[in-house]
């Protein structure tokens, strides 16, 4: 079995993404130099025509980061318990969430992307969420989708 030392986990706070983080950490632990990067993409839903000040955007981003810290602490504990280095990054307002994940993986020479099967969108009947499907389609490295 291939050893994946550089693992990227895409997190949105959903249960599948938290499970994906745990599995990504365990997989990375099997390598000699485990390194997991957890990314959370903050995508605001501000309509383009809305006039928003930079301070309003900063406030929204800070709130999103504070909310994410609640579930990121669980991921940090899992990494610490497994002796795996964890780096947490936030990507703010990309044109595409899928492109942000795929580009990050490519730019940082990631060995494996681990992502939850469905996010927080609420489409529970879908077998695979649109973000997971997009990452599977466009990533140049292996992708593990966790249910």
Please place each PLM-identified region on the residue numbering.
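Structural beta-alpha unit
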Residues: 2, 77-113
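Small/aliphatic-rich secondary-structure junction motif
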Residues: 2-55, 82
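Short alpha-helical
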Residues: 15, 96, 122
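General small-molecule cofactor/ligand-binding pocket signal
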Residues: 37-39, 87-91, 144
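Gly/Ser-rich helix-loop-strand patches that form or flank binding pockets
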Residues: 106-147
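A short acidic, glycine-rich active-site loop
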Residues: 56-70
């Amino acid at each position: 079995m291939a050893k994946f030392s550089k693992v990227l986990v895409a997190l949105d706070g959903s249960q599948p993404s938290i499970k994906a983080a745990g599995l990504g950490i365990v997989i990375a632990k099997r390598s000699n130099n485990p390194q997991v990067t957890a990314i959370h993409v903050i995508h605001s839903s501000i309509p383009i025509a809305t006039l928003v000040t930079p301070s309003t955007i900063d406030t929204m981003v800070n709130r999103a980061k504070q909310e994410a810290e609640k579930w990121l602490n669980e991921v940090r504990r899992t990494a610490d318990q497994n002796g795996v280095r964890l780096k947490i990054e936030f990507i703010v307002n990309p044109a595409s969430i899928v492109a942000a994940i795929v580009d990050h993986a490519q730019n940082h020479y990631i060995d494996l992307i681990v992502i939850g099967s469905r996010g927080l969108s609420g489409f529970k009947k879908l077998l695979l969420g649109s973000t997971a499907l997009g990452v599977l389609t466009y990533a140049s490295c292996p992708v593990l989708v966790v249910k």
